[in-house]
Amino acid sequence: MILYLFLDESGNFDFSPTGTRYLVLTGLVTRDVMPAVVALHRFKHEVITQGENLEYFHATEDRQWVRDGVFGIIGACDHLAVHTVIIEKARLDPALYDTRRFYPFACRHLFADTFAHEHPTSFDRVIVFMDNIPVRRVRRATLKGIKENLKGYLAPSQHYDILMHASKSHPYLQIVDYLSWAVYVKWTRAERRPWNNIAHLIRTEHEVFEDSERRYY
């Protein structure tokens, strides 16, 4: 049996008052990647027949009525488990601004929450998917951060893969994009409607610096 983990982030890496307040890292866990695929494909073609040149779903760019349809499909799923960490950037130690240090830090928190609920050693294989990262330095740092933290939860001989694929190539990368965006707009804009559609799927929603008062800017 395979455990699938799809990752997505929301927010930017501008660690200054002009950047986004939060960075959100979200993990979608499932054992079955077939449910919702047909429904999303069918809905995509319904959108196209309405005159939209839609190649794939992307929450920040899709029209509201398209988002409503996608959230309806995701919300009807009962095989998904969502784990998410929220990092208020002003409270993050500047030593962690570099992506080579940030990703291990963020993954450590996300995986601690995720694997407190899931038990990866009971699976034959763990496959992690995330969207392509075009910048080589950031891509390498991300892969290293995932690998370093993931291996601590696996048996020594257990198989795992970490794959970076374009989100347009995999429906579940588009689903986790929507999930992460829903959490992000809840925290940044107090916009709860998207989050309300998927709240029943969320197992953990962890604000990393909830108990910290220190700010760096």
Language model: regions and residue ranges:
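Phosphate-ester processing/binding pockets and catalytic centers
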Residues: 1-217
